[in-house]
UniProtKB/Swiss-Prot annotation:
It comes from the Bacteria. Belongs to the GSP E family. ATP binds at residues 217-224. GO terms for molecular function: ATP binding; ATP hydrolysis activity. The keyword Transmembrane does not apply. This is Uncharacterized protein pXO2-25/BXB0023/GBAA_pXO2_0023. It comes from Bacillus anthracis. Pfam families: T2SSE. CDD domains: VirB11-like_ATPase. InterPro entries: P-loop_NTPase (IPR027417), Sigma_54_int_dom_ATP-bd_1 (IPR025662), T2SS/T4SS_dom (IPR001482), T4SS_GSP_E_ATPase (IPR050921).
């Protein structure tokens, strides 16, 4: 009988489920239900069948568990045996998590607000545990993770994973997971943590008037989230094509009422191929989640043919993004650098640069914590004469301040053509109060 002990004070934590019993069940399931175990990582019905088998065939291992905890313990056992263990529990219990990594010694958990070492039950996080976890991910997508195949890149559900085998590290295997959920992380309600409200209004008119935009920043600054927010302002009558190598934006589920094609690269199809294909589908917008190489040249040609583009790239600042486009174009094409850069400066309208900073603050109880803040550092307007600052935000000496510049007559004329107007307010070193964020030094 399951859960013979109830309400007697014996509240055994299911994370302490006997490892030997776990291993016994694991080996037995592999021998008796090998195909079902494989299916259970991807198929919910197979996972439920595994739960039924465990409950039916292994009651002796659950005799000392409180009756009201048995289902939770079985769920834990299943997550360890056929799921992704601590990873799926973290994702389920902490919906704000964006990144989980293992550096060979510690499991690091990160969200938009914090970065910390995962300490609970850390005795479980061993090299063997992590390697087994990576191999589950690899198997799920039809790849191997072995000394002969030491680098693994893959996508499993909402998780993007990269792992390097201990064969090629100084120590244990390493792993990085990016968790992408189908929601609008940056939105109107929390926008003021990112930039002032008048910039949110600016984003709307920029998209309504169909401007070409480059979003730059380091890894982890939130470029994709800005791209998704901008996408939210695309009108139904402006067909959009989203091109990405991994399913990060989830634009089809986020914006079911928009006319959007959502394409993925892979199986021999490149970003370049999909840009060329996009031109045959009569879109107003071509959105490319990230530029990395020679596909940049075809993207520029799409702009020159009258299509509108929003894309992201790695660049040190918004001012150098046009030069980065030139250099990436050169990877696959012979180009006249000066002429190409002039085209970029003339036909791309704005550059947005994003930064992130870790600040000292307090939680709701007053406890000192460190918080990751992603913020809009700069907006520039491009022209053949150069870059004009539109907005700039800085973090200095424990304070966020922002200033505004000017918008060109050409931009105002563009708005007037579609009966829109926008006045950029004037600010110089204005202190930016971030909602819910009290910074201490």
């Amino acid at each position: 009988m399951f859960g013979a002990k109830k309400g007697n004070g014996h509240n055994k934590d299911f994370y302490d489920f006997n490892p030997k019993n776990l291993e016994t069940i694991r080996n037995d399931l592999k021998n008796r239900h090998a195909e079902l175990v494989i299916d259970a990582l991807l198929k919910e019905e197979a996972r439920q069948e595994i739960k039924r088998i465990i409950k039916r065939d292994y009651p002796v291992h659950f005799m000392d568990i409180d009756e009201d905890k048995v289902d939770d313990v079985i769920e834990y056992v299943v997550s360890e045996l056929v799921g992704t263990g601590v990873i799926e529990r973290l994702i389920k219990d902490r919906p704000d998590i964006t990144d989980i990594s293992y550096n060979g010694s510690h499991l690091i958990v990160e969200s938009s607000d914090y970065k910390e070492i995962y300490k609970d039950n850390e005795h479980q996080i061993t090299e063997q545990y992590i390697t087994r976890l990576i191999q589950k991910f690899a198997h799920a997508v039809g790849k191997e993770f072995t000394p002969k195949n030491p680098i693994f890149d893959g996508v499993y559900g909402s998780i993007r994973i990269n792992a390097v085998h201990s064969q090629n590290t100084n120590g244990n295997s390493t792993m990085s997971l990016r968790i992408v959920r189908p929601n609008l992380v940056l939105n109107e309600k929390n926008f003021e943590t990112f930039a002032p409200q008048f910039i949110y209004d600016f984003f709307k008119v920029v998209m309504e008037s169909r401007n070409n935009i480059l979003i730059s920043g380091e890894t982890g600054t939130g470029k994709t989230e800005v791209l998704k927010l901008l996408f939210s302002f695309v009108r139904f009558d402006h067909k959009a094509i989203m091109i990405e190598d991994v399913p990060e934006t989830h634009v089809k589920s986020l914006f079911p009422d928009k006319d959007v094609f959502s394409w993925l690269t892979g199986n021999g199809v490149t970003v370049t191929d999909e840009i060329v294909a996009a031109l045959r589908n009569n879109p107003r917008w071509i959105m490319i989640s990230e530029l990395r190489g020679k596909e940049t040249y075809e993207m520029i040609q799409a702009v020159l043919s009258g299509h509108h583009v929003v894309t992201s790239l790695h660049s040190v600042d918004a001012e150098t993004s046009p030069k980065r486009l030139v250099n990436m174009s050169k990877i696959g094409y012979q180009v006249d650098e000066k002429s190409l850069e002039e085209d970029i400066m003339r036909y791309f309208n704005f550059g947005f640069h994003i930064k992130r900073v870790v600040v000292k603050t307090t939680d709701t109880t007053g406890k000192p914590i460190k918080r990751v803040v992603r913020y809009l550092a700069k907006i520039v307007e491009y022209s053949v004469e150069g870059c004009q600052m539109v907005f700039e935000q800085k973090y200095r000496n424990g304070k966020f301040t922002f200033s505004t510049g000017t918008l060109s007559e050409e931009f105002h004329d563009k708005l007037a053509e579609i009966d829109l107007s926008y006045e950029l307010p004037k600010y110089t070193d204005e202190v930016a109060f971030k909602k819910g964020l009290i910074i201490s030094r």
